């Protein structure tokens, strides 16, 4: 008897916890890693709707630590799930001398060690071209939003949910949804997934626009510098409109001090903004 497709979905129950083993680890930069976790069989997929994410759970120093991550792999990938994660080491940031609990835990995992996954989780679903389903909160019914142009503001590892959508939309030749990404980082070295983003921007130049801003740019930098501003949004993202949606993901200062006030200043209404 053939195995049903549904049986090959790893995340069968969003409330359950699934232990998955670390099968590969790649150093992307001095503080960023790609972690590959194995699924129950080589034929399994994760089972994550586009727009959703997973939680990782670990007992660290007698405390249950839970963090949300968007995989950079998709349900086209069988047998594994990939996460790209920035490690927050201790004694690097004066505000956080202890560093990140979960990211340092992941950094110290050995091949074969398992960690608990839970999901899918999320309020955003991208089911068909130009159509998003958005829940106001976890328990509410999703509302449909038709989108012609998606604007994206990402900071640091906040790029991963954007990449999930960018890949999905550009892969589907029938999907004509336009996308514009404003990607904020501290330094040029911090730009995650740059090669892939620039390849997409070249291959799908009519559909996808890419712009960067850096806190500490090099002298020959040709993009923007400083915090995300109203001027940057005005120049590089779609204007307010019924079929516009601006997605925002990144650290709290990016959202609270930069993106949100700037979008409000430019008259984007609540239904035109989605914050991960």
Swiss-Prot record:
Question: What is the required cofactor set for this protein?
Answer: FAD
Q: Name one GO cellular component term.
A: mitochondrion
List every position bearing Phosphotyrosine.
18
Q: Which residues bind FAD?
A: 107-137, 146-181
Q: A Gene Ontology molecular-function term?
A: cytochrome-b5 reductase activity, acting on NAD(P)H
What reactions does this protein catalyze? 2 Fe(III)-[cytochrome b5] + NADH = 2 Fe(II)-[cytochrome b5] + NAD(+) + H(+)
Which keywords does this Swiss-Prot/TrEMBL entry list? Acetylation, FAD, Flavoprotein, Lipid biosynthesis, Lipid metabolism, NAD, Oxidoreductase, Phosphoprotein, Steroid biosynthesis, Steroid metabolism, Sterol biosynthesis, Sterol metabolism
Which interval of the chain is the signal sequence? Answer: none
Residues covered by the FAD-binding FR-type domain: 15-127
Chain coiled-coil ranges: none
Single biological process term from Gene Ontology: sterol biosynthetic process
Task: Tell me which InterPro entries the record gives.
Answer: CBR-like (IPR001834), Cbr1-like_FAD-bd_dom (IPR008333), FAD-bd_FR_type (IPR017927), Flavoprot_Pyr_Nucl_cyt_Rdtase (IPR001709), FNR_nucleotide-bd (IPR039261), OxRdtase_FAD/NAD-bd (IPR001433), Riboflavin_synthase-like_b-brl (IPR017938)
Q: Which residues carry this modification: N6-acetyllysine?
A: 17
Q: What EC designation does it have?
A: 1.6.2.2
Q: What class of enzyme is it?
A: oxidoreductase
Question: What PANTHER family does this protein map onto?
Answer: NADH-CYTOCHROME B5 REDUCTASE (PTHR19370), NADH-CYTOCHROME B5 REDUCTASE 2 (PTHR19370:SF108)
Please explain the role this protein plays, according to its UniProt record: NADH-cytochrome b5 reductases are involved in desaturation and elongation of fatty acids, cholesterol biosynthesis, drug metabolism, and, in erythrocyte, methemoglobin reduction. Responsible for NADH-dependent lucigenin chemiluminescence in spermatozoa by reducing both lucigenin and 2-[4-iodophenyl]-3-[4-nitrophenyl]-5-[2,4-disulfophenyl]-2H tetrazolium monosodium salt (WST-1).
The family this protein is said to belong to: Belongs to the flavoprotein pyridine nucleotide cytochrome reductase family.
User: Know the name of this protein?
Assistant: NADH-cytochrome b5 reductase 2
Q: What is the lineage of its organism?
A: Eukaryota, Metazoa, Chordata, Craniata, Vertebrata
Q: Which gene encodes it?
A: Cyb5r2
């Amino acid at each position: 008897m053939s195995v049903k497709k549904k049986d090959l979905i790893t995340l069968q129950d969003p409330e359950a916890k699934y232990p998955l083993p670390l099968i590969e680890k790649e150093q992307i930069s001095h503080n960023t890693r790609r972690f590959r976790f194995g699924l129950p069989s080589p034929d399994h997929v994760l089972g994550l709707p586009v727009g959703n994410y997973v939680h990782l759970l670990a007992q660290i120093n007698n405390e249950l630590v839970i963090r949300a991550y968007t995989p950079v792999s998709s349900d086209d990938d069988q047998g594994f799930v990939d996460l790209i994660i920035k490690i927050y080491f201790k004694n690097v940031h004066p505000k956080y001398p202890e560093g990140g609990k979960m990211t340092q835990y992941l950094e110290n995992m050995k091949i074969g060690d398992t960690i608990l996954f839970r999901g899918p989780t999320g309020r955003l679903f991208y089911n068909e071209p130009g159509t998003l389903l958005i829940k106001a909160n976890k328990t509410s019914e999703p509302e449909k939003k038709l989108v012609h142009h998606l604007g994206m503001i990402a900071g640091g590892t906040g790029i991963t949910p954007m990449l999930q959508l960018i890949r999905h939309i550009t892969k589907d030749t029938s999907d004509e949804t336009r996308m514009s990404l404003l990607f904020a980082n501290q330094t040029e070295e911090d730009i995650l997934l740059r090669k892939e983003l620039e390849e997409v921007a070249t291959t799908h130049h009519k559909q996808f626009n890419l712009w960067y801003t850096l806190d500490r740019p090099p002298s020959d930098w040709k993009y923007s510098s400083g915090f995300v501003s109203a001027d940057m949004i005005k120049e590089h993202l779609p204007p307010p409109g019924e079929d516009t949606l601006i997605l925002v993901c990144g650290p709290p200062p990016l959202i609270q001090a930069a993106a949100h006030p700037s979008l409000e200043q430019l008259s984007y209404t609540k239904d035109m903004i989605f914050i991960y």
